[in-house]
Amino acid sequence: MKASKIREMTTQELHNELKKLKRELFNLRFQLATNQLENPMRIREVKRTIARIKTIMRERELEQERANKNVK
């Protein structure tokens, strides 16, 4: 998933997507361990998407903190 598409999502949607991707990553790792995984590149894609989501969530936290500092 592209970062621009992730940025369009709300915070709640990001949390839901993060949960879904973590569940998928768990299942992919399980499939890898049992030699049932068809596309090993999917693990890499999911891990990178999780990292993108976490990065954008952190950016939003920092923006909120900066906004709160400027108000005081």
UniProtKB/Swiss-Prot annotation:
GO biological process: translation
Keyword Transferase annotated: no
Entry's Gene Ontology molecular function annotations: structural constituent of ribosome
Alphabetically ordered keywords of this record: Ribonucleoprotein, Ribosomal protein
GO CC, one annotated term: cytosolic large ribosomal subunit
Database matches in CDD domains: Ribosomal_L29_HIP (cd00427)
Family label: Belongs to the universal ribosomal protein uL29 family.
Protein's name in the database: Large ribosomal subunit protein uL29
Source organism of the structure: Caldicellulosiruptor bescii (strain ATCC BAA-1888 / DSM 6725 / KCTC 15123 / Z-1320)
Encoding gene per record: rpmC
